[in-house]
Regions:
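Bacterial N-terminal signal peptides that target proteins for export
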Residues: 1-9
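Bacterial N-terminal signal peptides
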Residues: 8-16
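Glycine-aromatic-enriched surface loops/turns that form tight recognition elements
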Residues: 60-156, 160-242
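Intrinsically disordered, low-complexity regions enriched in serine, threonine, proline
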Residues: 1, 19, 233-236
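Alpha-helical segments with a strong preference for the paired helices of cellulosomal dockerin domains
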Residues: 23-25, 31-59, 164, 168
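Sec/Tat signal peptide C-region and signal peptidase I cleavage site
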Residues: 17-23
Length: 242
């Protein structure tokens, strides 16, 4: 039996916003020379720091994305006054995601730098109703690349961190920004709409304890869990960014 893992809105704080490379810094810099300081760099720094008596003078972490929450709640789920709760709506921390429709079937999050495939209701490969096993979702991305969708051939299935940047915890069904649930209707194309199912979307991230499972993000309410790779879920491609 799977143990369900529910990640709170605070997980958004782990999302990296593109930062300037600090390759010149031998301790806190771009350790893996990816062009930005990433989680992988941070892990490398921590490993090297073990046993060192001196304090590391590392730059401050990048500002996290805001969760989107505008109301506070008690344990029973009732809306309460935010004063003194320490909840996201009270603190109002982070920066908002801002989106640009590129007019070619894609939409770019200017905050993270991620460019997302828009989804349609026209029966095409972009149709929001298409479902895939995990391997089929990867094959779908290969097809988009072979077709040079929107002029690019570097599309991929988003990892768990990238997929969670779509979430807006101020709403549900779907728990996303309105830019990802706009103008949907029978026959609409990626040039005229951007659709989403309030359901499970695959990520490329394999579950650590077993290669037979992978992580998904539930666009209904924002929780994250893993499931068998043979299950059929929805998919959306991404490129660039983090």
């Amino acid at each position: 039996m799977r143990i369900r893992t529910v990640l709170s809105a605070a997980f958004v704080g782990l999302l990296a916003i593109p930062a300037q490379s600090r390759a010149a810094d031998p301790i806190c810099g771009d350790v893996n020379t990816s062009g930005t300081v990433t989680t992988a760099d941070a892990l490398s720094v921590l490993k090297r720091a073990v046993g060192q008596p001196v304090a590391l003078q590392c730059p401050a972490a990048a500002t996290p994305l805001e969760s989107g929450q505008s109301e506070c709640f008690n344990e029973g789920g009732d809306v309460i006054n935010c004063a003194g709760t320490g909840q996201d709506a009270a603190l109002k921390k982070g920066v908002p995601a801002t989106y640009t429709d590129n007019g070619n079937g894609t939409i770019t999050d200017e905050t993270t730098g991620l460019t997302w495939e828009k989804l349609s209701e026209d029966g095409s490969i972009h149709d929001e109703g298409n479902v895939y096993t995990w391997s089929e979702a990867l094959d779908r991305v290969d097809t988009l690349n072979s077709q040079s969708f929107a002029g690019h051939n570097d599309w991929r299935l988003p990892n768990i961190v990238e997929a969670r940047t779509l979430l807006n915890f101020d709403t549900f069904s779907p728990a996303v920004a309105p830019e990802f649930d706009s103008n949907c209707g029978t026959g609409c194309t990626v040039l005229t709409c951007n659709c989403i199912q309030p359901d499970w979307y695959w990520t490329s991230t394999t579950y650590q304890e077993t290669n037979e499972d992978a992580w998904f993000v539930d666009m209904y309410n924002g929780y994250t869990d893993s499931t068998t790779k043979t299950e059929q879920n929805f998919a959306r491609a991404v490129r660039g960014g983090l």
